[in-house]
């Protein structure tokens, strides 16, 4: 079967976990893994699995006679900002797993269909990938005046990049809650949980809704969208049924629905408690396969 050719740029934890997922894809062939450290564990694992592994960076990749159809960038925002124009000039679609946010933000279960031909798409944040689908599930049934999410992740799964970009996490996720999730106002909070043993990623979503909103329809929509996410993130699940609260004197006449989530990682390269990272690589794979379907269809 013909497959779209892909390169993973970045041979760290995210890039290596993504490699395992792409190796299982029926329509993407991860042909190259690119890094800058010749002693990288990711490059070694890629080479062991027959993937062309180079520590000579993007310059080397783009100088090859054969080039990828899709690049998955798992480096840093700074590096991606430098590389993105080069990918675009060569007609290579980019899936950005960094905070660079140069292209439209995508959550596969919500708005992938709008961006299949985009030259560059951004995956927001792990908290966004987990919670925006739930805000969307509510907002497609009734107006959401305000949505607040709390993403709690195991401290060992949060590397220096995450810790240095907490403000960016909250700003970017809040924006996605509004622009993709459909809430009029969004707020995001991240908690790094130091518990031992490390816990799975847990997310709480609160949406303010009209007092007369159809609660049965909202519940059905939440389950429907959760199933859509589970199709590409098997460890994504509701921890309980949605909980509804009636209006209170301080709620402005609005009711509230609470949604409680858990994300268990697949354990491909990262440990299962790293659901916050796994959901990013799973979403990247789903987006890449959408790109590949478009690319392969156009080449027939």
From Swiss-Prot:
NAD(+) binds at residues 11-14, 157-165, 276. Keywords: Aromatic hydrocarbons catabolism, NAD, Oxidoreductase. It catalyses: acetaldehyde + NAD(+) + CoA = acetyl-CoA + NADH + H(+). The active site is at 126 (acyl-thioester intermediate). It is an enzyme of class 1 (oxidoreductase). SMART domains: Semialdhyde_dh (SM00859). InterPro entries: Acetaldehyde_dehydrogenase, Acetylaldehyde_DH_C, NAD(P)-bd_dom_sf, Semialdehyde_DH_NAD-bd. Gene3D superfamilies: Dihydrodipicolinate Reductase, domain 2, NAD(P)-binding Rossmann-like Domain. GO terms for biological process: catabolic process. Pfam families: AcetDehyd-dimer (PF09290). This is Acetaldehyde dehydrogenase 4.
């Amino acid at each position: 079967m013909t497959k779209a050719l892909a390169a993973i740029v970045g041979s760290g934890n995210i890039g290596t976990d993504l490699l395992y997922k792409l190796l299982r894809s029926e329509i993407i062939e991860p042909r190259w893994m690119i890094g800058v450290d010749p002693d990288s564990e990711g490059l070694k694992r890629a080479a062991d699995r027959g993937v062309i592994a180079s520590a000579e960076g993007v310059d080397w990749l783009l100088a090859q006679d054969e080039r990828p159809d899709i690049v998955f960038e798992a480096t840093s925002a700074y590096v991606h900002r430098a590389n993105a124009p080069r990918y675009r000039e060569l007609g290579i679609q980019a899936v950005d797993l960094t905070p660079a946010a140069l292209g439209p933000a995508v959550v596969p279960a919500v708005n992938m269909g709008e961006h299949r031909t985009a030259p560059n798409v951004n995956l927001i944040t792990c908290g966004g990938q987990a919670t925006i689908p739930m805000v969307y599930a509510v907002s497609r049934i009734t107006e959401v005046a305000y949505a607040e999410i709390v993403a709690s992740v195991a401290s060992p799964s949060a590397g220096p990049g995450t810790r240095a970009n907490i403000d960016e996490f909250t700003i970017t996720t809040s924006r996605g809650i509004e622009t993709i999730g459909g809430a009029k106002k969004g707020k995001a909070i991240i908690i790094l949980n130091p518990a031992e043993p490390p816990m799975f990623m847990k997310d709480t979503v609160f949406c303010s809704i009209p007092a007369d909103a159809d609660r049965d329809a909202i519940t059905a929509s939440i389950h429907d969208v959760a199933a859509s996410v589970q199709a590409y993130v098997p460890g994504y699940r509701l921890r309980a049924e949605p909980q509804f609260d009636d209006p209170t004197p301080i709620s402005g006449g609005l009711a509230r629905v609470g949604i409680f989530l858990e994300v268990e990682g697949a354990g491909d390269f990262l440990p299962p408690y790293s659901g916050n990272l796994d959901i990013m690589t799973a979403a990247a794979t789903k987006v890449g396969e959408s790109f590949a379907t478009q690319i392969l269809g156009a080449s027939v």
